[in-house]
Each structure stands twice: as structure tokens, then as C-alpha cells.
Amino acid sequence: PPHAAPAAGQIARRSELVLIPVRPSAFDLAAVPAAVEIVTAAKVRGAFVLSACPFRAPEIGETRAALEAYGLPIVPGEITDRRAFARAVTTGSAVTEFEAEGKAAEEIRALWAWIKNTLERK
């Protein structure tokens, strides 16, 4: 929301890395410039995470191509819109606990590995 920008900027300035989740949708892409502006103004590293992606949808590639214009890294892969995420929440668990060997947990572990590697490269 527009009124959240001041708080988001304060939080970003105190961060080492800001992840910008982007769903493959026109609404999310319309919000990207404001998010990039917050990251740039905070002088902090930022990266896009494709999230809530429909399985194998062509929009994923189109969204990735649109994000490349902003010059921030795009986390490899994506977080797919899987039932395991919703089911895990109803049990009060993270998807890595709920279905540890499932595809959703694999995607989250891959995201965490990328974050960890990025932070270690300061």
C-alpha cells in the first residue's frame, strides 16, 4: 500500500538484503517500480523472488523478462502456488515441517540456500 512506503524504507535501511516477492501478474508488476525505489533509496541489496507462480505457466518467463529491466538479481527458480503451503498454514507449520520432502519444501530450501549464499558474499 502507498502509505506503507515510509515504514518500508526504514526497514529496508536496516536490512542486508530485501527480497521483493512478485507474482506473475500485472498488479504485482505495477508495484515493482515503487519497491525498487525503496531498495535503491535505502542503498541495500535487493532481489526479486517469483512467488505464487502457476505451475509451468508462460507468464513466469514473461514476468522474469519484465523484471530484468530493473537491474536487480532475480532469484533462480520460483515459488510455485502449491496446496502444501495452504495446508501447512492450517496446521501451524512451515511447509518444510509439514511436507519436508515435498516440492514446496524443496523450493523454500533452494530460496534459503540462495539467500544464505548471497549474504555470505557481502
Residue map of PLM features:
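Short, basic/glycine-rich phosphate-binding loops at helix/coil junctions
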Residues: R13-L17, V89-G92
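Beta-strand-loop-alpha "switch" segments that mediate conformational coupling across diverse proteins
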Residues: P54, R64-S93
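Short, hydrophobic alpha-helical segments
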Residues: W112-K122
